[in-house]
Amino acid sequence: MQICLMDETGATDGALSVLAARWGLEHDEDNPMALVLTPQYLELRKRDEPKLGGIFVDFVGGAMAHRRKFGGGRGEAVAKAVGIKGDYLPDVVDATAGLGRDAFVLASVGCRVRMLERNPVVAALLDDGLTRGYADADIGGWLQERLQLIHASSLTALTDITPRPQVVYLDPMFPHRQKSALVKKEMRVFQSLVGPDLDADGLLEPARQLATKRVVVKRPDYAPPLADVATPNAIVTKGHRFDIYAGTPLTE
């Protein structure tokens, strides 16, 4: 994959070349998207809109730390949607990991989560965030046990994952409506890189075959059901809904 590769003064010498080789990235000086290695973290920038700032994954501080400490925890919609109740903490495959936020919420309340991400730039951002998170004295211990990254396309990987999870979580990128042009700055940068998941409909059936309990699909409130498969089971929040589908139970 081609992207502009940059490092800032103070970044570890040679680290950018190692990173590019690991994730199969090629430097393209004219690419409007840039992957920048700073002394603190790896971040994604939209070069033609510098005011949007950079995107990076931070499980330790910022919004993620605030959500972990002061958010709803088990009361969050995503936790309810995957079925967390009492001592039941399902094993989850997040098949569209993105920036890892929902996966982190689930891990922080006790679920084991395997994140799948096919875009090598996004996978590199997630890996950078995980590396720093694993090294953190406060969260590193449980984060290493509960949150892992698999760099692969869900369209193929969902048929190969073992052991089977109880829940598969899907949050495919969906085009924003025109009147929502003032989408969060962060999402504008992110969508410029990955675009909408035009093949997302193909995820529902393999997800249902893989999950032993349920599949949860996060959708904007205006979006049709994934693959146009309606379900009466959903948790509705302001602006979103979590559609819930039955999985395929284990056979003895």
UniProtKB/Swiss-Prot annotation:
> Which terms in the GO cellular component ontology are assigned?
cytoplasm
Q: Where does S-adenosyl-L-methionine bind?
A: 101-102, 117-118, 153-154, 171
Q: Which Gene3D superfamilies match?
A: Vaccinia Virus protein VP39, YhiQ-like domain
One example GO MF annotation:
rRNA (guanine-N2-)-methyltransferase activity
Alphabetical keyword list: Cytoplasm, Methyltransferase, rRNA processing, S-adenosyl-L-methionine, Transferase
UniProt keyword annotation of Endoplasmic reticulum present: no
Q: In terms of domain of life, where is this protein from?
A: Bacteria
Q: Which CDD domains match?
A: AdoMet_MTases
InterPro entries in the record, alphabetically? 16SrRNA_methylTrfase_J, SAM-dependent_MTases_sf
To which protein family does this belong?
Belongs to the methyltransferase superfamily. RsmJ family.
The record's subcellular location field reads:
Cytoplasm
Catalysed reaction(s) here are:
guanosine(1516) in 16S rRNA + S-adenosyl-L-methionine = N(2)-methylguanosine(1516) in 16S rRNA + S-adenosyl-L-homocysteine + H(+)
Keyword Ribonucleoprotein in the entry? The reply is: no
What is the name of the protein in this document? Ribosomal RNA small subunit methyltransferase J
Whichever gene encodes this chain, its name is rsmJ
What are its E.C. numbers? 2.1.1.242
Q: What's this protein's function?
A: Specifically methylates the guanosine in position 1516 of 16S rRNA.
